[in-house]
Amino acid sequence: MSELTHFDAKGNAWMVDITEKEETHRVAEVRGEVVMAPATLELIQQGGMAKGDVLGVARVAGIMAAKSTPNLIPMAHPIMITGVNIDFQILPPDRVEIRGLVKTGGKTGVEMEALTAVSVAALTIYDMCKAVDKGMMIQNIRLVSKSGGKSGDFMREGESQWEK
């Protein structure tokens, strides 16, 4: 396992200096899901939630969250994000899977931005549906793949191709 990069020799937290790192094309894909009562999923699909278009608002929230990551994660660098896609799969009878894909051409990866995007999209779904279903669960938020950078590529075993 690699050494932790956000601590100096004395154990003090610090922001990694990326000044000399090479700019490369970087992509991170993260997935997660919100599990809910089947009736809640039906309301989402039918556009019947009182707060409006649940998935549309969650998509915008996820995009905004990716761009706000350095304000939330102390050691995350403010970077030029070149693309954010938030997609959803309805998985009857009781869940919505969320996929966040974040891209940059920079000196550091976008894993934290993708994780933040999916997390906030899931929280937004919860917020918009909690009036009818307080038992929803946000779960299984994970990095599926990343490419670019010094540490190389990563692909989680056992993940299926995203179906749109």
Curated annotation (Swiss-Prot):
Q: Record's superkingdom?
A: Bacteria
What does the record give as EC number? 4.6.1.17
Spell out the molecular function terms from Gene Ontology.
cyclic pyranopterin monophosphate synthase activity
Q: Which reactions are catalysed by this chain?
A: (8S)-3',8-cyclo-7,8-dihydroguanosine 5'-triphosphate = cyclic pyranopterin phosphate + diphosphate
Q: What is this protein called?
A: Cyclic pyranopterin monophosphate synthase
Metabolic or biological pathway:
Cofactor biosynthesis; molybdopterin biosynthesis
Per its UniProt entry, what is the enzyme's top EC class, as one word? lyase
Q: Extract the InterPro entries matched here.
A: MoaC (IPR023045), MoaC_bact/euk (IPR047594), MoaC_sf (IPR036522), MoCo_biosynth_MoaA/MoaC (IPR050105), Mopterin_CF_biosynth-C_dom (IPR002820)
- Outline what the protein does: Catalyzes the conversion of (8S)-3',8-cyclo-7,8-dihydroguanosine 5'-triphosphate to cyclic pyranopterin monophosphate (cPMP).
What does UniProt list as this organism's lineage? Bacteria, Bacillati, Bacillota, Clostridia, Eubacteriales
User: Which UniProt keywords are listed?
Assistant: Lyase, Molybdenum cofactor biosynthesis
Encoding gene (name): moaC
